[in-house]
Amino acid sequence: MPYIPLMQLQQLRYFTAVADTRHFTRAAEREHVAQPSLSQQIRSLERELGAELFHRARGHITLTDAGETLLPLARRILADAETARREVQDVAQLRRGRLRLGAPPSLCASLVPDVLSAFHATYPGVDLIVTENGSQDLVRALADGALDLALIITPLPVQAPALATSELLREELVVVSAPDRPAPVTGRRTRIHVEDLRGRPLAMFRRGYDLREFTTAACRTAGFEPTFTVEGGEMDAVLGFVRAGLGIAVVPSMVAERSGLRITPFATPGMHRVVSVAHRGDVSPSRAARELERILKEHLGLGPSAAPRPRPGPPRGPRGAVAGDRDRP
């Protein structure tokens, strides 16, 4: 293997300083170093390269042919090193960079926009890339390195040992229906039971999405299969189907409160889901990911070691209360 000189950036800085000033003492003053130290570094560089870089005549310093060859290369190396330092610092200090977040559609329609708005206000130079998908797909994307951070529903049906998770909140699920259609409960009842969903047309997400799996599991536990009349891949689509009277839907309370639809809570003990933030356990998250997680927990009123916060459901009130008739959060 050929010998490769181990030039140092400091040596190249000293070399360009002498080339600029044509004087060792003035070069040392410019670099804030003792003149003997600068001269020693130049001699060391010349030994590494196997060529003299300067003609040294008393009071007259000029570049040799080797020095003339090295000078533009040294300037380019120093400029590239400065660019690398600056760009890495920009990323490290979040002046620029990229953050890839994954979340289920229901959270993208409620929690995520507010949190990303707060993050962007603090770090406007960081590009935000959001992927909507079910928790299982998001976990796979984390494992493949396609995401930096994900909001998922836990516990997962299949263990993911390489995943580090932190619970954020326990959110209530409710039933939404069109305000101009009959309420899903009758008489004096203000709350719905899972059994009341038997035979009712449901608007729901397609297979693989958390809310569909959650609703299906609850119905099967109650002894029946849910009836899905229409399926969608986006929260806005499902809410639109409900608004058009195509069915009712089970959605998180955070989504329901913004929907303008009639909200009917489940009877005690209710239906809930746990939202957690996750990243790969074998890789340290980037500073951008750590900052987003901090802002997320701050938004939810959680400290570094706080337990997941229950998400309050719709307030008790008369049957058929419509979310749009209440103060928005």
Q: Which residues are covered by each model-predicted region?
A:
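Short beta-strand-centered segments that line the small-molecule binding cleft or hinge
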Residues: 4-6, 91, 114-118, 135-178, ...
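A late-sequence structural motif
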Residues: 264-309
